[in-house]
Amino acid sequence: MRDIAVFSGSAHPDLAEEVCAQLGVPLSPTRVSRFANDCLEVQLMANCRERDVFLVQPLVTPVQEHLVELLMMCDAARGASAGRITVVMPHYSYARSDKKDAPRISLGGRLVADLLVAAGASRVLAMTLHSPQVHGFFSVPVDHLHALRELAAHFRQYDLSRATVVSPDLGNAKEAAAFARMLGAQVAAGAKQRYADDRVSISSVIGDVAGRDVIVLDDEIAKGSTVLELLDRLRESGPRTIRLACTHGLFAAGALGRLSEQPDVLEIVCTNTVPVPADDHTDKLRILSIAPALAEAVRRIHNGESVSALFDARPAG
């Protein structure tokens, strides 16, 4: 197999540029055009024959547009005789659709996985899937990265002697516990029940947060309804400080503004798995780059080295 070729869709070209800068390779151009009937056409503007092709495209708003674009990129690479096609998908939005929790409901996580493989993907590189079991939906290898090292390196600048990592729900408690171990902190979790996409109820917080420096950790923040509900429960216990952290800062429907307006929230930390428009930035927002981690994973995949070893090493910081 020949050298690496990295292409980016239109979802997050800045991240693809960062990854290529870390790898020391150029970002190959992609042409996306739209016909009068609203159909898309994608052309990869560099040779792919027998090359190790990496396609960078998080599934962010507009999700369906970016998904079709990614499928066409896979198809174009396969048609151009690529040696291997790895989809670098820092955010897989359909990971939320991972179970049949209502009659006659679609299972988007599995369907989109099948579509990517059918389009030509030979491997997937993902970051902090909303439901980790989703990687089992793929019939090709999936390398599942997380951003805990990057987040931990950021929070180590503070005094963590009274820190407690709080998961908004028990489903994310395992990741919160791992993060707490990295920081030498305590861990707590909210008792959450979801009624709709933007309607949640957190009845209590399980764990010690009174007088503590709280770091709320979630995999993603979309509308922010869960975090706002959790903040109400935390205030009842009287934490000393509150900071928010997530991997995917989606911040839909003005969520970033609402969270930044909370006077007791000192900081909102996310990574650049998804683009946050500059006009939405606030003084409390901190965006950490996961480009070095993605680039190292790409390098290891290309060279046939272990990707899981990235997490066996001592955490960053």
Curated annotation (Swiss-Prot):
Molecular function terms from GO: ATP binding; kinase activity; magnesium ion binding; ribose phosphate diphosphokinase activity
Name of one Pfam family that matches: Pribosyl_synth
Region (Binding of phosphoribosylpyrophosphate): 211-224
SUPFAM superfamilies, per the entry: PRTase-like (SSF53271)
InterPro entries: Pribosyltran_N, PRibTrfase_dom, PRTase-like, Rib-P_diPkinase
GO biological process: 5-phosphoribose 1-diphosphate biosynthetic process; purine nucleotide biosynthetic process
Catalysed conversion reaction: D-ribose 5-phosphate + ATP = 5-phospho-alpha-D-ribose 1-diphosphate + AMP + H(+)
GO cellular component: cytoplasm; ribose phosphate diphosphokinase complex
Known EC number: 2.7.6.1
Name of the protein: Putative ribose-phosphate pyrophosphokinase
Organism, as annotated: Streptomyces coelicolor (strain ATCC BAA-471 / A3(2) / M145)
